[in-house]
Each structure stands twice: as C-alpha cells, then as structure tokens.
UniProtKB/Swiss-Prot annotation:
Keywords: Electron transport, Membrane, Mitochondrion, Mitochondrion inner membrane, NAD, Respiratory chain, Translocase, Transmembrane, Transmembrane helix, Transport, Ubiquinone
Enzyme class: translocase
Record protein name field: NADH-ubiquinone oxidoreductase chain 1
Upper taxonomic lineage: Eukaryota, Metazoa, Chordata, Craniata, Vertebrata
Cellular compartments annotated: Mitochondrion inner membrane
PROSITE patterns (UniProt xref): COMPLEX1_ND1_1, COMPLEX1_ND1_2
Coiled-coil residue spans: none
Length: 318
C-alpha cells in the first residue's frame, strides 16, 4: 500500500518536471519573440519525451581521472533527496504525516549540498570544482535566512507541522501580515535553487556549466530533474506558507487544484524572472544575504516572537 502511495506521489511530480522544461522553453521563446520547441509532436508537446529518450539512451561517459563511485552516487543522491522532500507536503494529505515536517524539509535540503560538492570533487575538473564550491557556498548561505523565515512563520503557526498552516490561514493568508518575510523568502528560494539572477554556479563565460560540466546522458538528466523538482517544491512550499496552501474562499472544496494553481503562478514568476534579469556578481550575491537579508530576518523573527507575548496572544491556561 505504501509503495502504491509513493508511486502515486512520484509519477505526477516526474510528469510535472518533464512538462516544466517544455513550459520554460516555450515561455522564454515567446518572451524573446521566437516560437520555442514546435517540431516534436503537436506544438512541440512531445519534446520532453524526446529529450528523455535521447538522454537515457546515450552512453554515460565519465572522465578517466574521476572517482567513478562518487561520480555516480552524486546525481542519484541529488534526485532521491529532491523527491523525498515531497513526502511531508500536505496535498491535502501528506505521504508521511510528521510532527516536525518543517525540520525534516530543512534537514533534507541541507543534505543536498553534499551531492553538489561530491559531483564537483569527483569530476576531477577545475571548472566543476569551482562551480561546486560556488554553489555550496551560495546554498549554505541562503539556507540561514530560509531557516529564520521558517522559524518566524512557525511562531505564528504555533506548530512545526505544515498541515496546521491551512487552519492558521483560514481567516487571512500570511502573505498580508508577513509580506517582508515573503519577499525575502521568494528571493532566497531563487538563490537556493540556483536560478537566475543567482545562477552563479553555471556562469557559462567562466565555468562552462558549473558542477555538472563533466556529466552526460543519464547522470546529467538526474541533476537536471533534481533541479526542476526542487523548483516546483519550493514554490509549493511558498504557496503553503504564505498563500493558504489549498485554502480558497471561492472554491474551498477544490483542495489540490487550489494548491496547484498557486504553485503554477509562482513557477511562472520564476520563469519570468529568468527571462528578465541579468546574473548577479558573486560579491553582490553574498552582500545581499549577509549584510541585508540576515539582519532583517533576525529583526523580524524577534518581532514575531515578542508581538504575541506583548499582546497577550497566548493560549489560555486551563
């Protein structure tokens, strides 16, 4: 039964990842006044299938001087962790109902850093290693603000469980009282998923393709799928934390459709930002976090901690 549940969760995620790649290419094409993929199938709809067949039937090459075992483990770990992060997400019922689901997501996303570092080190290429070090420094740095923002939201929620956020936001979505946190959260998720304007790890003019430069065929596809799975997850998490998850005053019974619609709008925003913004310089990226976001999030966390106590917004003592 559990295996069936896992498959029912994973298959739609993999389909969503496949068609997100097509959506991204179509949207970028239209924004750059061109058509995008339009040859494979009607209106290019079978392009993801063709890409998957091409990648998984190619020979997986690896450099002679690379560490072969770690070279294969790194993309497998990245993809496994990206999928396991979906387990505690309520849609409307989570696969695993954890009391500390927020901590589980934070811990598992921290583990993903190892796959990036291993891939860069195991490739035995200076470009891959520099790209991996950049990506690791960026990911670890922005996880600090993500954790503090999550703590602030959990102080309002009163629990570390994602499922209770829906009840918390029945009267008002948390985007309204905590909009500065929401803005910093959204920018941090862009940095966490290595997306434009924070895709420093794959600066083509400097590092070719970043930490996955030596990868080809199946292992490269696993990294690619892990990245897009994380993008959808981060946007689903944003919808759950700030936009009332599947709460919609007009159609309260359409649980999953409400969550999916909000997630799709946020994913479209990710793609719009990719089409619009240039890449940051690395020192600007770090200054934004350590000199701007960190002091602001700490101040707002203290504010959200003291406000309920000062206004006596505490549960009644029985």
């Amino acid at each position: 039964m559990l295996l069936t549940n896992i498959l029912c969760l994973m298959m739609p995620i993999l389909l969503a990842v496949a068609f997100l790649t097509l959506t991204e290419r179509k949207i970028l094409g239209h924004m750059q006044l061109r058509k995008g993929p339009n040859t494979v199938g009607p209106h290019g709809l079978l392009q993801p299938v063709a890409d998957a067949v091409k990648l998984f039937t190619k020979e997986p090459l690896h450099p002679l001087t690379s560490s072969k075992l770690m070279f294969i483990i790194a993309p497998t770990l990245a993809f496994t962790l990206a999928l396991s992060l979906w387990a505690p997400l309520p849609m409307p019922h989570p696969l695993i109902n954890l009391n500390l689901s927020i901590l589980f997501i934070l811990a598992m996303s921290s583990l993903a850093v190892h796959s990036i570092l291993w891939s860069g080190w195991a490739s035995n290429s200076k470009y891959a290693l520099i790209g991996a070090l950049r990506a690791v420094a960026q990911t670890i740095s922005y996880e600090v603000t993500l954790a503090i923002i999550l703590l602030s939201i959990m102080l309002i929620n009163g629990s570390f469980t994602l499922s209770t956020l829906t009840i918390t936001q029945e009267q008002m979505w948390l985007i309204l009282p905590t909009w500065p946190l929401a803005m910093m959260w959204f920018i941090s998720t862009l940095a966490e998923t290595n997306r434009t304007p924070f895709d420093l790890s794959e600066g083509e003019s400097e590092l070719v393709s970043g930490f996955n430069v030596e990868y080809a065929a199946g292992p490269f596809a696993l990294f690619f799928m892990a990245e897009y799975t994380n993008i959808i997850l981060m946007n689903a998490l944003t919808a759950t934390l700030f936009f009332g998850a599947f709460h919609n005053p007009l159609f309260p019974e359409l649980h999953t459709i409400n969550l999916t619609t909000k997630t799709l709008i946020l994913v479209f925003l990710f793609l719009w930002i990719r089409a619009s913004y240039p890449r940051f310089r690395y020192d600007q990226l770090m200054h934004l976090l350590w000199k701007n976001f960190l002091p602001l999030t700490l101040a707002l966390c203290t504010w959200h901690m003291t406000m309920p106590i000062s206004l006596a917004g505490i549960p009644p003592q029985t």
